[in-house]
Amino acid sequence: MGDTNYFSGTVKLLGNPIQKVVRQKILTTKIWVELPQYRQNRCVLLVFWGNLGDEVKNFYQINDYIFIEGYTSIKKTNLKLNKIVITGLKVYPILFDLKSTLKNS
């Protein structure tokens, strides 16, 4: 039986990754993504730790689709809303423009 918080699926990148150093040595990368669904698309926050976040920032752009694996969590906000956060463990490219990615490197 699998873990109930484990997520794998296709997401669309909505913005540029934002990197931040935590505790003066741990790099985190956050990016808003969209989960394509039949009824209504959902936006969630995707978080990467360490070198994986650097790879996401360097290789992927806005509107690229990636397949991710990771764990989901729910963060409570002040507005009585719940924010879904996915901590990404693995990333696989699906639809992205390799030529423009190589030009930016």
Task: Briefly describe each language-model feature range.
Residues M1-S105:
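Single-stranded nucleic acid-binding surfaces, predominantly the OB-fold ssDNA-binding core
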